[in-house]
Swiss-Prot record:
Species this protein is from: Rickettsia prowazekii (strain Madrid E)
Protein name per Swiss-Prot or TrEMBL: Uncharacterized protein RP403
Pfam families, A to Z: PDDEXK_1
InterPro entries reported for this sequence: P-loop_NTPase, PDDEXK-like_dom_sf, PDDEXK_AddAB-type
Length: 870
């Protein structure tokens, strides 16, 4: 059964009772959220003058920043000490991370008045003595440095404030009520010990439990996030709490929420748009020009605009590798507004080139204010400008030999700053168990409920063992923490409705249910949470794909077109066979994939480069290279490649890699080329061809480019295709899945390459022969029986057609060849199959979404097949 009253309501009645007795009280709660809720109950229901109600941390809010060293300054002081210790080398980034650990350890030693020499004898191993000497050196040097500043550390300052508050309470003789569950720490421990005679405890009751608890195991964390969003959507009128202490998971959940929410966890300031903006600016200042870094900045939601999108389109594909901002101004601008935007951008970002950290930070602030004049009014702006100002003040402590390392340092420092997003009107709140356990909600969602995220197991100290921490008396993970999460869980179960979720898989690992839940299952039957989430979330998306989209009897989705293109390439035919929807998107919708700015050069880019090199070498062979020796021919081939690379915009490392690969196979290719030329009377390179067909009354032209066509002295013809990637198997060729060279063979026998010398070959007998569903037609008026084939074959006795795929690699074997001989029957079968394929699509114009045999599919995301695989 559900608790009739919440903890805070019961506590409010207790307070009223104490006040009626004339007892003056000061109330301390675990956090400010509970304080606000309690004040609201007391004012709304009892309309009394409120007693002092504060969170425990409020004791430390009376601060004068001039009295203590800021956290940033203390980190840099420790970082400098750590890097000076030569026995253990640290770079700046490592030293800052170590400084964060040592800062807490050293302050704990000071507060507890503990001598670090206590741990010297704890372990005599060489490893431990090495660690101890490092700790002792850093601790003693840190104490001296802090003393010279004549200030306290922030931790010591907080401890002094605590002592002042304890003295005040003793003088006033107030009764202190500690209400709720407090996480133990050194301050709270001291507070309870010093004021044990002044403190009254008000603890929650665990006697009730909801009768509306359900459980679900989504397949992965994204489906878990979708379920959370769906639950929130179904319960818009309810107060909902999503309980988690994991910021990464919270970010995933929030990405799916459509409604406003309050966030008690807070975000790293670097994860906000404004933090990402500063990070991106610093990366640009500290690194060589890089389009990826530039657009990492420009795509920030705070400054992204139509001009950015147009500039990105201009720089896609071949322009995506430009290596200097000056090349931006050499682009052909169709829009004067875009050109002006580009000029201003270069002036703002690339005019200055500072080298010391102070100048980098000042320039970062100036650039940010130019790009976004109201930047400090954005979410987290006030906190960020304060952080930036402090960092500039202490930047003299940052000694970097290479400024390229600074973006990581800045990001690390920024990650220590929290920003909170709280919306009073929101019905959804996200927080940790300790924030929400004592409140009441209509619905509690406990996501990713497993031992990894629902336990108090403390992470081991990176420098000290548990035993060493116990010797120093600074091990706070005592017995009380083992019951904390059990208490939180029991309190949360008192709400009206609870949904427990646990994704089966997260970060590639299987996730087991939490022990707390397993114990609950031993006592009660927990029903499975059921919701028709697929239908609710995804049906509208599928229906909105296209008004022509329709389900088929075999449960395949198809799209219908009103037209079919009249000009196709041989690669289009392969796409139509392997991926019908990809064909529809490319040829009918006119969608073409752009190579994004951040994309590295692809295998196909390397293939295009090699084709250009071989084409130029082959076409100029008779004029320039035929009489050269092997070494000079190889040098000529490599030189062609170097000249092409010189005039091509590519990253320097890519050019070097491609030069190495070209050099590796160049000698083998020259020998391969020489050997094949010996038996050839004519060779054609990069020659265009076409095949004309009439399909269901529509004229179709198929076009293609043959890499190389050889005519031997015996009138044998070979069509070759160079491949730097995967070559098709013989089965794929025979079954028509890779029809490129087959279609080029059909072009050849029907004079589709329009080469006059082909008329002198026996293939001229093919010129007036067309295939049509089992019969041969010599002309449009004469139908011939298939027996004509036997007569035709006898006249073809001296003509042989071979197709060959030549695989070129930069490792041995450098050249591999797959050859397939074709005869008239084989070509006839393939042409009949091609006609049938085209007849189906020309007639029906129906293209399947889920039929896909492609190794690479640029249009997969358009099919929205992820909805179907949910």
């Amino acid at each position: 059964m559900t608790a009739r009253y919440s903890f805070l309501q019961n506590f409010a009645e207790y307070i009223i009772d104490q006040l009626k007795k004339g007892i003056e009280v000061q109330i301390i709660l675990p956090n400010n959220f509970l304080c606000l809720k309690l004040k609201k109950i007391l004012t709304d229901k009892y309309k009394i003058k409120l007693p002092i109600i504060i969170p425990f941390n409020f004791i430390f809010s009376k601060k004068n920043e001039s009295d203590y060293i800021s956290k940033i300054e203390e980190l840099f002081i420790l970082s400098s000490i750590i890097t000076e210790y030569k026995a253990l080398p640290f770079n700046l980034e490592e030293s800052l991370k170590a400084a964060e650990i040592l800062r807490k350890l050293f302050n704990d030693l000071i507060i507890n008045n503990i001598d670090i020499k206590l741990i010297e004898v704890y372990n005599n191993s060489n490893y431990w003595q090495k660690i101890y000497k490092f700790l002792e050196y850093c601790f003693l040097t840190w104490k001296k440095t802090i003393a010279l500043t004549q200030k306290y550390t922030k931790t010591i300052h907080k401890f002094n404030l605590l002592q002042e508050e304890i003295i005040k309470i003793k003088k006033r003789e107030n009764r202190i009520i500690l209400a709720g569950i407090f996480k133990p720490n050194i301050y709270f421990k001291r507070f309870k010990e010093e004021l044990k005679d002044y403190i009254m405890h008000y603890n929650p009751s665990y006697n009730h439990m909801s009768n509306n608890i359900s459980y679900s195991e989504p397949n992965n964390i994204y489906q878990e996030a979708k379920q959370i969003a769906y639950i929130c959507e179904l319960n818009k009128d309810k107060h909902i709490a999503i309980v988690t202490n994991d910021n990464k998971l919270k970010k995933v959940y929030c990405n799916f929420l459509d409604q406003k929410y309050s966030d008690l966890l807070g975000n790293d300031l670097r994860l906000t748009n404004i933090g990402a903006l500063l990070n991106a600016i610093i990366k640009i200042i500290c690194n060589d020009f890089d389009l990826k870094l530039l657009f990492l900045l420009l795509k920030n939601p705070l400054i992204n605009c139509h001009a950015v999108q147009k500039l990105e389109l201009m720089l896609s594909n071949k322009n995506r590798f430009i290596s200097s901002p000056k090349y931006l101004l050499q682009l052909q601008f169709d829009d004067e507004e875009i050109r002006e935007y580009c000029v201003n951008l270069i002036d703002i970002l690339f005019t200055n080139n500072p080298h010391n950290i102070t100048d980098i930070l000042i320039l970062t602030q100036q650039i940010a204010e130019k790009l976004l004049p109201n930047i400090w009014e954005q979410e987290g702006g006030t906190v960020l400008i304060e952080f930036l100002t402090n960092l500039i003040s202490y930047s003299k402590h940052i000694n970097l030999t290479n400024k390229k390392d600074f973006p990581k340092i800045f990001s690390f420092l920024l990650s220590n700053i929290k920003h909170y997003k709280n919306i009073d009107s929101s019905r959804i709140i996200i927080g940790q168990p300790e924030d929400l356990a004592l409140c009441r909600f209509d619905l509690i969602i406990l996501p990713h409920f497993n031992n990894e995220h629902w336990s108090s197991n403390a992470k081991p100290h990176p420098l000290l063992s548990k035993k060493a921490l116990q010797i120093l008396n600074i091990d706070y993970d005592d017995a009380i923490t083992t019951t904390l999460y059990s208490d939180y869980f029991n309190l949360l179960l008192q709400n009206k409705q609870i949904v427990i979720l646990n994704a089966k898989k997260y970060n590639g690992k299987l996730s087991a249910a939490c022990n707390l839940f397993l114990r609950l299952q031993l006592k009660y039957v927990i029903p499975c949470f059921e919701c028709d989430i697929k239908k609710k979330l995804f049906t509208p998306a599928i229906n909105s794909l296209d008004e022509h989209t329709k389900p088929q009897d075999d449960h395949k989705l198809t799209t219908i077109s009103n037209t079919f293109p009249s000009v196709l390439s041989v690669t289009d035919i392969e796409t139509l066979i392997r991926n019908p929807y990809g064909f529809y998107a490319k040829k009918i919708l006119g969608l073409h994939k752009k190579d994004n700015i951040w994309e590295e050069p692809k295998i196909s880019d390397f293939g295009n480069f090699i084709h250009k090199v071989l084409e130029k070498y082959s076409k100029n062979y008779d004029k320039q290279y035929v009489y050269l020796n092997l070494h000079d021919k190889q040098a000529a081939l490599i030189n062609i490649g170097n000249n092409i690379l010189y005039s091509t915009i590519l990253p320097a490392y890519t050019k070097k890699t491609w030069q190495i690969k070209l050099t590796a196979f160049s000698k083998t290719f020259i020998l391969f080329d020489i050997e094949r030329r010996k038996n050839c009377k004519k060779i054609y390179f990069e020659i265009k061809g076409e095949l004309r067909l009439n399909i269901a009354g529509q004229d179709i032209k198929i076009i293609g480019i043959a890499d190389r066509i050889e005519v031997s002295k015996s009138n044998y013809i070979t069509i070759l295709d160079y491949k730097t990637g995967t070559i098709p198997t013989k089965k794929e060729i025979e079954f028509g899945l890779s029809p490129q060279l087959i279609i080029e063979g059909l072009m050849l026998i029907e004079n589709g390459f329009n080469i006059e010398s082909f008329n002198n070959l026996e293939t001229s007998q093919f010129s007036n022969i067309h295939f049509c569903k089992g019969n041969f037609i010599c002309s449009t008026e004469q139908m011939v029986n298939p027996s004509y084939l036997n007569h035709y074959k006898s006249s073809y006795i001296n003509t042989k057609l071979t197709i060959a795929y030549v695989k070129i690699t930069s490792t041995e074997p450098y050249i591999q060849t797959i050859e397939i001989d074709l005869n008239i029957e084989t070509l006839h079968k393939h042409k009949v199959g091609l006609i049938r394929l085209l007849e189906y699509y020309v007639t029906n114009k129906s293209f399947s979404y889920d039929f896909n045999l492609s190794n690479y599919n640029d249009y997969w995301h358009l099919t929205r097949c992820d909805y179907m695989s949910y």
